[in-house]
Regions:
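Acidic, polar-rich low-complexity tracts and alpha-helical solenoid repeat scaffolds
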Residues: 21-344
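Bacterial N-terminal signal peptides
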Residues: 8-17
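Bacterial N-terminal signal peptides that target proteins for export
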Residues: 1-9
Length: 344
């Protein structure tokens, strides 16, 4: 047994001490993070001056070598954050993430670009890039785990992206549409699966607030303002479909549609809004008829009259309105008899 130990030990020592070069080194650098570098490329992209380092990133971008763009641009920003070359490097860093399919991280890097270097970039162009990214997520693109593995859709994150666009540039060209799409994202979330109705209604409420803000902040743009009021109405209308919120929220929906019709009568959505108002008022009239019948059975004629009158006010030409008029004629004599008895 001992005869085998010494040779094996010798072989192990020689193996461990034998000089080897890793064919695929993974390197960590403070501020730059982990990176993979092939044996032939190690250090070739690194420079000692900001301009030279940025030039490496730009040359790599021209060749669509986005891995090198990422490394060179990130090093420029980390090592020389206050240099004149940092803004362009930050933009290239964001573009490298976008080109490599990590849209969420790209959005964040564009956001850093606008916050830290707002005077050194084409503000509108950067925000348009952010809108394209947010639009992809709103369209159903999945957010990725570790920037690599498509995992889940998130309308909440999509809404927050649009809201960040607005927060950073509230008067920019894309801000009104970003505010509207934030509301659209919350509506999509409300239409999805929820553990409770309360959570669903919270999301509709967030959509309402987004559209309300769009109207208040951008009402000088008639197209945006009219659409904001319309979408505010549809959000309230969808919320009202739950019985708990029926009357109060239905009135909010009607008010939003009526505001749109009064302020922007020529909007393409005018006819649809009118039809929605009529439908909701007809449904409210039906509810009033039901309550009126309850009072009528109890021989509470005056109470019944109140609700029949309400049904007529809401939808005079509807089936429910006509029914209310007929019942009012019937109970009128009972009301007179009751009044006569009370007078005696």
């Amino acid at each position: 047994m001992r005869r085998w130990v010494s040779p094996l030990l010798l072989v192990a020592i020689v193996f461990l001490l034998w000089p080897n070069i890793s064919p695929a080194p993974i390197i960590y650098r403070p501020g730059e993070g982990w990176s993979y570098e092939s044996r032939g490329a190690m250090g070739k992209w690194r420079r000692d001056r900001a301009k030279a380092q940025l030039d490496v990133a730009k040359e790599a971008a021209a060749k669509e070598d986005w891995r090198t763009v990422y490394k060179a641009a990130k090093r420029t920003v980390h090592e020389w954050p206050l240099s004149d070359y940092a803004p362009e490097a930050q933009q290239l860093l964001a573009q490298s993430y976008e080109a490599r399919g990590d849209d969420e991280r790209a959005f964040k890097e564009y956001q850093k670009l606008l916050r830290y270097y707002p005077q050194n970039v084409d503000y509108e162009e950067v925000q348009k890039r952010q809108m394209l990214i947010a639009d992809r997520f709103l369209g159903g693109q999945r957010f990725k785990l570790w920037g690599k593995i498509p995992l889940y859709r998130s309308w909440k994150k999509s809404a927050e992206m649009y809201q960040e666009v607005v927060n950073v540039g509230p008067q920019s060209e894309v801000a009104p549409m970003a505010q509207m799409k934030a509301g659209e994202a919350w509506e999509k979330r409300a239409d999805g699966f929820h553990v409770s109705e309360r959570e669903r209604h919270k999301d509709f409420g967030r959509a309402v607030e987004a559209y309300k803000k769009a109207y208040e902040e951008y009402q000088t743009d008639d197209t945006v303002a009219a659409e904001a009021l319309y979408k505010k109405g549809t959000s309230y209308e969808n919320q009202s479909k739950d019985a708990e919120y029926d009357q109060e929220v239905t009135m909010e929906a009607i008010n939003a549609y009526e505001d749109m019709l009064a302020l922007y009568p020529g909007t393409p959505k005018a006819e649809d809004a009118s039809q929605r108002i009529a439908k909701m008022k007809t449904e409210q009239a039906r509810g009033s008829i039901t309550i009126a019948k309850f009072y009528e059975k109890k021989k509470k004629w005056h109470g019944a009259k109140v609700y029949y009158d309400r049904a007529i006010d809401l939808a005079p030409d509807s089936e429910h309105g006509q029914r209310a008029k007929e019942r009012l004629a019937v109970i009128a004599k009972y009301m007179d008899e009751t009044d006569a008895v009370e007078t005696e």
